[in-house]
Amino acid sequence: MNVMENLEQHTPMMRQYLALKAENPDILLFYRMGDFYELFYDDAKKAAALLDISLTKRGQSAGQPIPMAGVPYHAVEGYLAKLVQLGESVAICEQIGDPALSKGPVERKIVRIVTPGTVSDENLLPERQDNLIVAVYQEKDKFGLATLDMTSGRFQISEPENAESLKAELQRLAPAELLYCEDFADMQLIEHYKGLRRRPIWEFELSTAVQLLNRQFGTKDLRGFGVEKAILGLCAAGCLLQYAKETQRTALPHIQSITLIQNNENIQLDAATRRNLELTQNLAGGTENTLASVLDKCVTPMGSRLLKRWIHQPIRHIQKLRQRQQIISEIIQLDLIGELQPYLQQVGDMERILARVALRTARPRDLTRLRTALEQIPTIKDILKNSPKFTALFQQIGDFDELFALLQQAIIDNPPLLIRDGGVIAEGYNAELDEWRALSDGATKYLEDLEIRERESTGIDTLKVGFNAVHGYYIQISQGQAHKAPIHYVRRQTLKNAERFIIPELKTYEDKVLKAKGASLALEKQLYDALFDRLLPHLGALQLASLTLSALDVLTNLAERAETLNYVAPDFSDEIGVKIENGRHPVVEQVLKEPFIANPVDLNQQRHLLIITGPNMGGKSTYMRQTALITLMAYIGSFVPAESALIGPIDRIFTRIGASDDLASGRSTFMVEMTEMANILHQAGANSLVLIDEIGRGTSTYDGLSLAWACAEWLAKKLRSLTLFATHYFELTVLPEQLAGTANVHLDALEHGDSIAFMHAVQDGAASKSYGLAVAALAGVPKNVVKLAKQKLANLEKLSQQSADQKLQDLRTINQNQGELNLMEEEDGKNAALEMLAQLDPDDLSPKQALAYLYQLKKLL
């Protein structure tokens, strides 16, 4: 049944509900009724299922019972948290009218919309990870992307250069909500994300976006932000800001600027690389044994979030990286880690508190925590003034003595959770409030005196004076003595064992006290709101201080990690290459019980592709990953696990390590592998670091070997990328003899009887054997199966007409006699076909001749 039809059949209250519901038909509506938020019809059914609450009925409307569910208003945050985690959005409808003055239903209004991407309440947010809302816009094969962190006001746009770059960015951002235009073409890029929101085309119009952004920032144009040429990014930003305003229903003063992220500012990491390197999430989807789990010992949540952003966006600005290194070195040399961290810990999550202040949703305890944060600043600055290396940090933190004094005077030490409960504003802050409170607080003494006086005058020893929220003040007498009540006692309530009365004097005092309590609460709320007015003019400076303190927390944390884990400062070079002496895997070395075997790597323009051979479990993947992680750590400004490291310019890091079926997209392991490899071959360049592990395993031996050979040759000759190429195809070890810039390295193992010991040390040259059967035995394959495999291996080797050496010699001969495929030039057949076409006059050919000519061309290709 469509409940919106024939509204006159519904009660006035239900008509009001349906009108409000029509404003937001696609999201749940929490409709305030007294001490509950009620949901009706389909919302009630959905909420009952999601929240595991009772589904009941509320009378009838239009002749039908109304499904209903409800949650208590004082416990609503827990229910909202669960719904937000499930990807639901909720419109909060409050009573804004006075029930005493309302003839019909109390006036109600939707005051905010809680969505997964725009929440700012700490109970609804993951503490140590960003909560982002993203908008994406597409024109043909070009994209615009806008990102907003409602909890900090950080607003950024970018223009991914292709679909693969967009995919990588979305994976990095992991948005809680994703807005897209209703005519978005490449839905396969975004359809698997939770929190998808389809938006109308007009919200992405450039003129609308520019107007909205200028109004937000109070500017005439956007040139001052350097974003005016990023047309597609601005289109996405306009939609995103419109959505933020629509959901928050209030000003957004903490969104004070917009930043354009240029693709060349950061090292580009595609989705496969982020996954394979296990930066903040392991391959199983958890957070254990990741790079972040080792590096992140930050003492503030905002520092932890910033460090994760650094990890996912390594920068290429060498001067900034050296500044970070210098600060880390200075913190270590001056022994400031233990001095700074206790004060930084007290700063807490200042970033998100400021967002709630800006949105005017900050609770009393938010303001006391902000006060505590401001209290730490003078001490932190006093520590930083010890070195000129800290000058920029010192200046950006600012001074907030006046704001600290204001909050110290205004808010008590341990306020209640909510302002509506009163008792938040400190005594002495406002004289009028103190007067109302004195009147209200004097009630206890007055009631004690009245009880003594009335008990003495009436001679009733069971007489008591009390109060409850329903009936107000009363005089209670037991049933056995109720007949002794004086004539001026007016009966107010009868209980099983007592009677309750009211007298004119008590009624007069009740009116006076209730008025005082009401006036006190109203004035306190007014004073609390006025605090926001006094804080907001300082919001920009406070946000800068918050960001600076976050960075100081990250740098102090990285100093602690460097000192604790024996890391060194890497050097940067203008020459292409990666040279690491005795590098270690930052995560694996923390997990291993025995000492980690450190290994060197030396990649440069003369030696840019290493063919890595050796047994499974020998450490090939660890060796490759540690090279990428050390490089990435250097480019976030961190010290690295090595004896020394010299890193040249890097623009991208690619990995092709491991694969599994992508069942959701109907792609086999081999298809996933080839897709990732194709992306590398299209995108990598001379400044790219490329890790390739066991390419070609998912098909037949000859197909796989051919593909692996061709990929290695393309990387070595055409792309000249810095490449670590692990393989079990022993045939590839002849490549260094034929390709300049290519070398063999291997990880060895020792066999003793049926046992095997992995050396984990990288050595020059190719491996002598694969040790596959020894690894199988180590894995627990039954001994008889391994024994049978050894027999089969011996038979196969005897049946082989050529020795391994002869096969390798044949490979060399084939390449020498036939010549290598020139990957940089057009094939001869294609050139001949083009020459024939150039000489052809199509008008001179009959249909039969044309068909014959087509066959000739086909033979040439």
Curated annotation (Swiss-Prot):
SUPFAM superfamilies: DNA repair protein MutS, domain I (SSF55271), DNA repair protein MutS, domain II (SSF53150), DNA repair protein MutS, domain III (SSF48334), P-loop containing nucleoside triphosphate hydrolases (SSF52540). GO terms for molecular function: ATP binding; ATP-dependent DNA damage sensor activity; damaged DNA binding; mismatched DNA binding. ATP binds at G614, P615, N616, M617, G618, G619, K620, S621. InterPro entries: DNA_mismatch_repair_MutS, DNA_mismatch_repair_MutS-lik_N, DNA_mismatch_repair_MutS/MSH, DNA_mismatch_repair_MutS_C, DNA_mismatch_repair_MutS_clamp, DNA_mismatch_repair_MutS_core, DNA_mismatch_repair_MutS_N, DNA_mismatch_repair_MutS_sf. One of its GO terms (cellular component) is cytosol. One of its GO terms (biological process) is mismatch repair. Keywords: ATP-binding, DNA damage, DNA repair, DNA-binding, Nucleotide-binding. The keyword Lyase does not apply. SMART domains: MUTSac (SM00534), MUTSd (SM00533). It comes from the Bacteria. This protein is involved in the repair of mismatches in DNA. It is possible that it carries out the mismatch recognition step. This protein has a weak ATPase activity. Belongs to the DNA mismatch repair MutS family. This is DNA mismatch repair protein MutS. It comes from Mannheimia succiniciproducens (strain KCTC 0769BP / MBEL55E).
